[in-house]
């Protein structure tokens, strides 16, 4: 993926802590867009299979990401909160292989930082929700337009219900036709994408 496109994906690591309503710590939001610049306190949601619950979860992640520089959660903790267990395991394998390659002076390491890389941690990110597919299912795609520091980009965030909340399972640009961060990592690890067993 291009670094520009990764900017958009990077901010997504911070998506966990469920919240309810259209107010986040005194910051007014509407159902279509918000500026994520404060921490959202976790609150139970009666039914997570609603568009509102999905938006609240995504909003909470962005709030946490924006607070990293202000003494909030560190990125490792954020990853563990925001991502599915299978994505975390894949990220760990990629990091291990990359560290070995770097230690051996090999330049074939994984450079894509995914959702964690964007211009200026702590910079408020404006999130516009463009679409959420089938919120009544356990797997959804959320189409977002992100903007910060005068930049804009579109991202497709794939979420799965795990441990009672929506977690990031993959992320990609709008126009990648299904190819995302997960597939890039699998390719780097040499996993046969047509036949995962071989």
Regions found by a protein language model. Give the residues of each.
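Short, low-complexity, disordered segments immediately C-terminal to signal peptides
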Residues: 21-44
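Bacterial N-terminal signal peptides that target proteins for export
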Residues: 1-7
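Low-complexity, intrinsically disordered terminal/linker segments enriched in charged
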Residues: 135-139, 143, 147-154, 170-198
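Short, aromatic-enriched amphipathic alpha-helices that serve as compact interaction elements
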Residues: 47-70
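Surface-exposed, charged secondary-structure patches
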Residues: 86-151
């Amino acid at each position: 993926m291009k670094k520009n496109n990764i900017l958009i994906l990077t901010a997504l690591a911070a998506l966990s802590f469920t919240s309810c309503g259209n107010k986040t710590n005194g910051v007014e939001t509407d159902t279509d867009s918000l500026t994520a610049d404060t921490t959202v306190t976790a609150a139970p949601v009666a039914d997570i299979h609603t568009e509102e619950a999905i938006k609240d979860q995504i909003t909470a992640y962005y709030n946490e990401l924006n607070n990293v520089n202000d003494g909030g959660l560190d990125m490792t903790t954020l990853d563990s909160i925001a991502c599915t267990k299978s994505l975390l395991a894949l990220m760990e394998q990629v990091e291990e292989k990359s560290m070995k390659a770097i230690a051996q002076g090999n330049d074939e390491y994984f450079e894509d930082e995914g959702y964690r890389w964007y211009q200026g941690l702590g910079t408020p990110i404006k999130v516009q929700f463009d679409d959420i597919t089938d919120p009544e299912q356990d797997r959804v795609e959320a189409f977002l337009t992100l903007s910060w520091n005068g930049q804009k980009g579109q991202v497709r965030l794939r979420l799965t219900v795990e441990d009672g909340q929506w977690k990031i399972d993959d992320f990609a640009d709008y126009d990648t036709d299904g190819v995302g961060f997960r597939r890039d990592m699998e390719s780097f690890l040499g996993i046969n994408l047509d036949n995962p067993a071989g």
